[in-house]
Amino acid sequence: MIRMFVRHPVADYATWKQAYDAFERDRVGMGVRGHAVFQSADDPKDITAWHDFDTLEAAQAFVKSDQLREAMDAAGVTGEPTIWFTTPA
C-alpha cells in the first residue's frame, strides 16, 4: 500500500470541499482506495489530505493526471501542492 499526502492552500474551504466530494467517483476510478481531509488548526484554508493506492505507479499517475489538475484548479486550489508518498513502517 502507498499513502500519498498532499498539502495546498485553497481560496475557500467550503467551495473546495464541495468540489473534492464531487470528485469521488473520479478518485476511485483512478485507483484511490481510501482518503481523508484535514485543515490546519490555525488556518482553515491550509488543507492536507491523504489518499491510499495499491501501488506507487498508481499514485504517481493520479498526481500527473490532467483530470486531477483541472479539478484542483476548478476547486480553488491557490498554490502549488506539496506531495509526498509513504509506505507502512
Segments predicted by a language model, with ranges:
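Short S/T/G/P-rich N-terminal loop/turn motif that feeds into the first structured element of a domain
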Residues: 1-70, 74-89
